[in-house]
From Swiss-Prot:
Xref: PANTHER family: CAFFEOYL-COA O-METHYLTRANSFERASE 2, O-METHYLTRANSFERASE-RELATED
This protein's name: Caffeoyl-CoA O-methyltransferase 2
Signal peptide positions (record): none
Organism: Populus trichocarpa
Top-level taxonomic group: Eukaryota
Gene Ontology MF annotations: caffeoyl-CoA O-methyltransferase activity; metal ion binding
Keyword field: Lignin biosynthesis, Metal-binding, Methyltransferase, S-adenosyl-L-methionine, Transferase
Named cofactor requirement(s): a divalent metal cation
Entry's EC annotation: 2.1.1.104
């Protein structure tokens, strides 16, 4: 009985406030990962941008350092060259991508806020990577619709990373599945949404976490049922679901 009581207390503690960036239940363990294998191997330009972004009032929006490392290696493993990113913020994941793709690789990057992108742009420029990036300011859906209408972009993307408005993830997926190549990957970020996907309905949550929670749950259910893709959900960062197009 004592063990069960301790377990219940632990579970209650985890749900005191849903909204922690790391999904690991031990902050010490997460810090160990960062200090042992992430920070020592982090490129200097990514470290600079990470530290710059940490001063931003909305720094929680950035891709975590361990996820940036994961994306960088993943892109190298699949030999990605033509990529897309929806939701850029200050550009940490964008920089991880630019470092991974070849010299003639391209990233179509879209965000509604150019100011945040330009905060990190000097770091990207100093690293000599700006030529790989085409940045478009504004909502991504009209751009995607135009690309699909043009017809020449179907199945042309090796990798697409989405870290934007969660209430549009389903709408993005409907379009991106046409633009990614067969065998290519789409990565949806925040699919475990601060752990809120398994939190009790009455658990205290930050307002933005509670607002987007149902949209994330809807996406996860839709991806699991989509016969056009293979999926893998990973507890990296705030949860990332990789979708490999198979048809």
């Amino acid at each position: 009985m004592a063990a069960n009581g301790e377990e219940q207390q632990t579970q209650a503690g985890r749900h005191q406030e849903v909204g922690h960036k790391s999904l690991l239940q031990s902050d010490a363990l997460y810090q160990y990962i960062l200090e042992t294998s992430v920070y020592p191997r982090e490129p200097e330009c990514m470290k600079e941008l990470r530290e710059l972004t940490a001063k931003h009032p909305w720094n929680i929006m950035t891709t975590s350092a361990d996820e940036g490392q994961f994306l960088n290696m993943l892109l190298k493993l699949i030999n990605a060259k033509n990529t897309m990113e929806i939701g850029v913020f200050t550009g940490y994941s964008l920089l991880a991508t630019a470092l991974a793709i070849p010299e003639d690789g391209k990233i179509l990057a879209m965000d509604i806020n150019r100011e945040n992108y330009e905060l990190g742009l000097p770091v990207i420029q100093k690293a000599g990577l700006e030529h790989k990036i085409e940045f478009k300011e504004g909502p991504a859906l009209p751009v995607l619709d135009q690309m699909i209408e043009d017809g020449k972009y179907h199945g042309t993307y090796d990798f697409i990373f989405v870290d934007a408005d969660k209430d549009n993830y389903i709408n993005y997926h409907k379009r991106l599945i046409e633009l990614v190549k067969v065998g290519g990957l789409i990565g949806y970020d925040n699919t475990l949404w601060n752990g809120s996907v398994v939190a009790p309905a009455d658990a205290p949550m930050r307002k933005y976490v509670r607002y987007y929670r149902d949209f994330v749950l809807e996406l996860n259910k839709a991806l699991a049922a989509d016969p056009r893709i293979e999926i893998c959900m990973l507890p990296v960062g705030d949860g990332i679901t990789l979708c490999r197009r198979i048809k």
